[in-house]
Curated annotation (Swiss-Prot):
Keywords: ATP-binding, Cytoplasm, Kinase, Nucleotide-binding, Pyrimidine biosynthesis, Transferase. Inhibited by UTP. This is Uridylate kinase. It holds the Pfam family AA_kinase. One of its GO terms (cellular component) is cytosol. Its main location: cytoplasm. One of its GO terms (biological process) is 'de novo' CTP biosynthetic process. Homohexamer. It comes from Burkholderia ambifaria (strain ATCC BAA-244 / DSM 16087 / CCUG 44356 / LMG 19182 / AMMD) (Burkholderia cepacia (strain AMMD)).
Length: 237
């Protein structure tokens, strides 16, 4: 079976790295994620990753109460850097060549984000991990995923979550909630379905960049998506 996508951008939340822990990075969880990523890389699909920082610090969370919002957001960006380095290290142990590019300069640790370099690295079969969000406060890492996905020419943004798609209602609260196999951007907006934050969602819609929402906890889900199988929910124009 041929790959459905040549180049994808995977959005990982920081919380996904916690596993069952209350905080930080769960090594077994990150190794399982990397095993899934290795399968996709082995198929020849070019993979970029945008990673969040919510397992360490969230600029909009309670820990930032009373703090200047921009300062809190910069702290969140530094948290994504820690996650990116952990992910790169786990990939190295799995035999995957990965590069971290940061929207904030930290030259002794990672490369700065340079679009042509990122594209070249993807073409060389390396995984490129984008850290520090957009490099600007007030923008989420979802927006960074939409931005970087558009910049490097990804064919789809794969948003890894704790649920296996977009539902008509919260499946934890409403047992009758149904999963959408596909849904348009406009329909998702009209139904007030929170796929991504408004800025990220609008950017994907304007760039005609589809979003595939899937469960990061479901073994093999990432590979099935790349092979074009029905997995999660596809949000399309």
């Amino acid at each position: 079976m041929s790959n459905a996508y040549k180049r994808v951008l995977l959005k990982l939340s920081g919380e996904a790295l916690m596993g069952d822990d209350a905080f930080g990075i769960n090594r077994a969880t990150i190794e399982r994620m990397v095993a899934d990523i290795a399968e996709v890389v082995g198929l020849g699909t070019q993979l970029a990753v945008v990673i969040g920082g919510g397992n360490i610090f969230r600029g909009v969370a309670g820990g930032a109460a009373g703090m200047d919002r921009a300062t809190a957001d910069y702290m969140g960006m530094l948290a994504t850097m820690m996650n990116a380095l952990a992910l790169q290290d786990a990939m190295r142990h799995a035999g995957i060549v990965a590069r971290v590019q940061s929207a904030l300069r930290m030259d002794q640790v990672v490369e700065p984000y340079i679009r042509p370099r990122a594209i070249r690295q993807l073409e060389e079969g390396k995984v490129v991990i984008f850290a520090a969000g957009t490099g600007n406060p007030f923008f989420t890492t979802d927006t960074a995923a939409a931005l970087r996905g558009s910049e490097v020419g990804a064919e789809v943004v794969l948003k890894a979550t704790k649920v296996d798609g977009v539902y008509s209602a919260d499946p934890k609260k409403d047992p009758s909630a149904t999963r959408y196999a596909t849904i348009s951007f406009d329909e998702a907006i009209s139904r007030n379905l929170q796929v991504m934050d408004a800025t990220a969602f609008a950017l994907c819609r304007d760039q005609k960049l589809p979003i595939r929402v899937f469960s990061i906890n479901k073994p093999g889900a990432l590979k099935r998506i790349v092979l074009g199988e029905d997995e999660g929910t596809l949000v399309h124009v």
